[in-house]
Structure formats: structure tokens, C-alpha cells
């Protein structure tokens, strides 16, 4: 199930956020025995709220029968730190309970208390999927998408995130000019705020023809390292291997270490997970591997299985 399926539920639910200067998490908090020490592989791992999206009201499927209590984003940092000893996080935009300044202040304090850091916000908002989104040839449509994305760059800056992920919408390989223009604007805006704007192979052209994303990166600028490679978002193994080899040289913040299904030995069965890790290492990737579990069954267990496999190959 894709995040964009839930965009309609988010429309009208978020207010504009006041612009506040970004701050680093406090360094004066007492040391915590659960924080990974130097050399611990967990320091290279994050967990996305999307892994547990069935426990967030905004993205729970109507037919979901998974047992357990629903989650609130404010409680996510402490829960993940306690349960998995992971202190890097991704917050998907629909999972925010609010974007009012008081809520963001509380959320930032919860991150600090858990000794955790926000790595990325996947910006799944209706404005980025109206018409052609950031790739629409109509300047008015694109302007709305750009404005919506900028609001989330502001939110990310306030929370101290390293990046926000903004989908390009309906990219047209025969005319990348509108898409390039949108990301030039967003990259410049993000740079001024200390936030990278990144792009995922998240279906459509980006997944089926990843070389078009490379053309987009090159069009935005030689120093634009805007890739968010997702291990699973490809139609087949040859495209996956080719796509990851193309995208990882342009990735510096985060990639998605996807978990789908596992055998009795705990190995991912739907795609070649070790090969994905090998490609990332060969490319010299030094960023964060963020877990996105999207398989059947208990998602808490799925996150653990994905974490275990990631630790084996990292």
C-alpha cells in the first residue's frame, strides 16, 4: 500500500507553521544506556513511521484488523528508542497530529528526551499530487506544490531534520524542464534552511526508468545529491540493480531499507536484500538506512526482522 493512497485524508488538516529558527537537539541531557555507542551499527539505522502506518489513524486501512493500541507521533521517539534502541527517525507528513508551533515544540522536546534525531520527512501532501505536481507544465499548479513543500521545509528546519522528501509527481521524460525548475527552487530554499530536498524512486517514471531521476539531479545542479534510493520500489530485479547503481552516487542523507517478507531464517524473500546493501557500500554511501516495513503480519515483528537483516549486512 502506497502512502499517496492516504493523501486525501490529510487535506485541510494542517495549518501553516510559524517560521522558527532550527535548533540542534540539546546536548546537555544525561547519557542513556540505550544509546548506541561508537561503532554500533544502530547509529546508521533509522525507523520510519510508515513501518507502523496501520497504527496511525490517518493511514490505517479501513479493513485493517491488526490488534493493539493506536499510535501518536509524540510517543514515537520514546517507543522506538525503548523497543529497538534506534535513535534516528523518519516522520511521514500525514502522521503529524498538528503543525501548530506548540505541537512542534512538544515534538522537538520528545525527540530530545529520547536522545533521538529526525533524519527525513517524507512529504506526502495533496499539493504534490494535484495534476502533475512538481512536474506539471502549468505554473499555477506547480506553484501550489512548491508552496506546500516549502511549508514542510520550514517544519523540518524547526525540528532539525536533515532532509525532506518531495515526490516529483508525473515526470515526463520528454520534458523535464518543469520538474527541474521546481527542484531548483526547492533546493535553494532548503539550502537556506539547512535542509536537503531529496527524491525517492516512489513509483512511476522514477521506479521504472531511474535514469530519468539522474537526468533530473544533473539538471538541478552538479552539487545536487538528492536521491533517496528505496530497495524495493522497482518493477523487477534487473531494474532494481541498475537503478540502485544509478541512484546511490547521488544519495548522501538516507535510503530506505525495505522489509516485505521473510523466511524462517529471517531472510528477505521478495528481493535480494544483500545485493542492495552491497551496491550501497560500493557506491560509498555514508548515510542512514531507514527501515520501512511494508509486509503482511505484525509490523512490530516485521520491523525487528528488517532490523536484524540490516544489522547482519551493514
Model segments located where?
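A short helix->loop->beta-strand "cap" motif at the edges of active sites that frequently abuts
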Residues: 116, 195, 283-287
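Short acidic/histidine-rich active-site segments
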Residues: 290-294
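Hydrophobic residues within beta-strands of alpha/beta enzymes
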Residues: 89, 164, 255, 288-289
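Acidic/histidine-rich catalytic cores of soluble enzymes
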Residues: 59, 88-89, 173, 177-279
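N-terminal pre-domain/capping segments
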Residues: 2-158, 174, 191, 222, ...
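Flexible, glycine-rich active-site loops centered on histidine and acidic residues
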Residues: 49, 167-168
